[in-house]
Each structure stands twice: as structure tokens, then as C-alpha cells.
Amino acid sequence: MTSVASEPLSSQKRWIVIYPAYIDKKKTAKQGRKISQILAVENPTSVEIHDVLAAVGFNPLLERTKCYPRDGERDFEVQGRVRVQLKNDDGTAKHEQKTRDEIFKMVAEMIPKLKTRQPGYTAPSVASSSAAAAGKKNKKKK
């Protein structure tokens, strides 16, 4: 069995892991928050973390079935984690964010700017289903 340390840095096993609890404002440091509460964001999801990292230029890997070990509630919305490559095989930084903490802070800063976090946003599936239901109500019987 080979150790993870012997794998190249580009191997997905060597990528850093980001759980939503790491940047959740409602979590304490004991519950797993890794950045200061001032910089943290309320109720981040693994999908939001993935979207932010993809928009910035990272190549993130979303693992929806994984759970944070310290999280007792195991809610499906916050379930999941994201893996990101931090360094190239030669040890140089892959992006301008060189450390885990820099990536955590950047993600927490960008999540409130997502469309889904803007006031007045409705999910497309909710809007289309309500329009379809409204169309059915207006039908007349023959």
C-alpha cells in the first residue's frame, strides 16, 4: 500500500478539502470553523463553494456524498465537500491563492456575491413549476 505523501501533488488524493463548516459563521472554532467569524458566511453549501472556485479558475471536484465528521446534524443541503488542487507537481502554487487559509477567505468573500444569495432571486425550477400550475387552473371543462 502506497502512502498519500508519495503521490504527485496533482493527484486528487493530495488536493485540499473544503467542507462548508470551515467557512460557516454559525459554527464555532470547536465545531470546525477555520476562519474568523467576521470573514465567515452564513450557511454555505458545497455547491456554492464549488461554483465560486470554478468561477475563479480552479478545477474543483464536488463530492456530494461526503459528510463533515464533526457535523452532528448531517443535513443534505450542507452535506458534501469540495477538493481543490493547491500546488503543481513541482511544488509551485497553482493559483494566486497560495495557502488553504487564503482560499477559505476568498471563497467566504465571494459566496455572498452569488446570484443565488441576492435578494429577490427565485430558483428556476420553482418559477417554472408555478407557471405550469397556473396554466392548468385556467383550463375549462368540455
Curated annotation (Swiss-Prot):
<feature type="compositionally biased region" description="Low complexity">
    <location>
        <begin position="123"/>
        <end position="135"/>
    </location>
</feature>
<dbReference type="GO" id="GO:0005730">
    <property type="term" value="C:nucleolus"/>
</dbReference>
<comment type="subunit">
    <text>Component of a signal recognition particle complex that consists of a 7SL RNA molecule of 300 nucleotides and six protein subunits: srpa-72, srpa-68, SRP54, F37F2.2/SRP19, F25G6.8/SRP14 and ZK512.4/SRP9.</text>
</comment>
<comment type="function">
    <text>Component of the signal recognition particle (SRP) complex, a ribonucleoprotein complex that mediates the cotranslational targeting of secretory and membrane proteins to the endoplasmic reticulum (ER). Binds directly to 7SL RNA. Mediates binding of SRP54 to the SRP complex.</text>
</comment>
<feature type="region of interest" description="Disordered">
    <location>
        <begin position="115"/>
        <end position="142"/>
    </location>
</feature>
<dbReference type="GO" id="GO:0008312">
    <property type="term" value="F:7S RNA binding"/>
</dbReference>
<dbReference type="GO" id="GO:0005786">
    <property type="term" value="C:signal recognition particle, endoplasmic reticulum targeting"/>
</dbReference>
<keyword id="KW-0687">Ribonucleoprotein</keyword>
<dbReference type="Pfam" id="PF01922">
    <property type="entry name" value="SRP19"/>
</dbReference>
<keyword id="KW-0694">RNA-binding</keyword>
<keyword id="KW-0963">Cytoplasm</keyword>
<keyword id="KW-0539">Nucleus</keyword>
<dbReference type="InterPro" id="IPR002778">
    <property type="entry name" value="Signal_recog_particle_SRP19"/>
</dbReference>
<comment type="similarity">
    <text>Belongs to the SRP19 family.</text>
</comment>
<dbReference type="InterPro" id="IPR036521">
    <property type="entry name" value="SRP19-like_sf"/>
</dbReference>
<keyword id="KW-0733">Signal recognition particle</keyword>
<protein>
    <recommendedName>
        <fullName>Probable signal recognition particle 19 kDa protein</fullName>
    </recommendedName>
</protein>
<dbReference type="GO" id="GO:0006617">
    <property type="term" value="P:SRP-dependent cotranslational protein targeting to membrane, signal sequence recognition"/>
</dbReference>
